[in-house]
Amino acid sequence: MSTDELAALPWRLDSPLSAVPSAVDAQLKEYLSRSQEEFSPIGSLVGGAITVLNHFIVNGGKRVRPTFAWAGIRAAIEGGGGSPDALCGKGGDATSSSSADFNQGAILNALSAFEFIQACALIHDDIIDRSDTRRGFSTAHRTFESKHRERGWLGSSGHYGVSQAILIGDLAFAWADDLYNGSGLSATALQRARPAWRAMRTEVIAGQILDIALEANGSEDVADSFAVIKYKTASYTVARPLHIGAALAGANEQTQSMLRNVGQDIGEAFQLRDDQLGVFGDPEVTGKPSGDDLRTGKRTTLINEALRSGGEPQVAALRAGLGKGEDSTEADIERLRDIIYDTGAQAKVEKLIEARTQRAIESLQAGGLGADITAELTQLAEKLTHRRF
């Protein structure tokens, strides 16, 4: 079945995890279209900025967070102590037309809200990292910068680009709350999940603050880079979406705790894979320039492990070569890759990925959930932690 056909199906409480991305895409397009209309009276200058945000959200993205939130909902209902009644506050028969209609709008609104937080995080992260491309397109701040330059406007094009990108990122963060709290899910369900929703928003920002501070103080401690992974990525990418979905559907505390732990392991493995791809990935597949972490000198777990494991000449060469920005040639980047590989860091990080993925899968299989959601979550964990993009 094609993604378009999946998106057209009525949403049911047993809809597969694989159906989430296309369904969320359709929901996002509908919400963004309405939002664009709301801004039209203000004028084209604001409307143009909203168009950049719309393009950023609609084009690309794996919809990982909505998928895990849906997994949390299904896990709660399929053996985790939850129910459709707890989620919707009415009905409970997901095959009835009224319940299906309610679920399709309310549930997909709540799932789609995660993508606005992700948009804010990525737009701001690209500014912080001075990135030029994202998902094969120009980053938001570079897009605004180019428009300013092309039109011959006053002032600094770079400052204009950063300023506008900050604002549309802030807007995305606000829209996340609007869409989530106005989703149509029951007030009781939203209240039950509110602590986890609030924690997720705080953790991702705290993780970014920590990341910037550690970069500034020059920390090369693997424990520090893992702390960034925990809060900036693992918690808000996997652990909290699973937690929020389970809480919305009324999962018992045992299931919620198990899913948080599973999510933390998958999320850490997901980010460790991202660190590997940032150095060794194929730009044609990832959509991002290879070696950016080497050019910026970002102390990821992979790089910190290389600095810890390497011999004195290797460590000296890494420190001399990291963070040279655009002065780094392709030959320089390739040399750094070779050094990192030779220290054994790449192999050690690969083992960390495998250990966390396996622990998550074993916890899922022992978690008492239904066979279908256990199998789908296992497959998703393996897909994300062994990806090439």
Protein language model regions, located:
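C-terminal helix-coil-helix/basic helical segment that borders enzyme active sites and/or dimer interfaces
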Residues: 77, 88, 92-99, 245-254, ...
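Divalent-cation-assisted or electrostatically stabilized phosphate/pyrophosphate-binding catalytic cores
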Residues: 135-169, 218-235, 257-261, 283-309, ...
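Short hairpin/turn module used for nucleic-acid contact or packing/dimerization
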Residues: 334-389
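Conserved N-terminal diphosphate/IPP-binding helix and adjacent helical/loop segment
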Residues: 1-111, 119, 123, 130-158, ...
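Residue-level signal for inorganic ion chemistry
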Residues: 68, 176, 207, 303, ...
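Well-ordered alpha-helical scaffold segments within catalytic/enzyme domains
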Residues: 71-77, 175-183, 240-248, 306-310, ...
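All-alpha helical catalytic cores of prenyl diphosphate-utilizing isoprenoid enzymes
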Residues: 41-43, 57-65, 163-175, 181-280
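Active-site alpha-helical segments that house and flank conserved acidic catalytic motifs
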Residues: 106-135, 195-205, 243-246, 254-283, ...
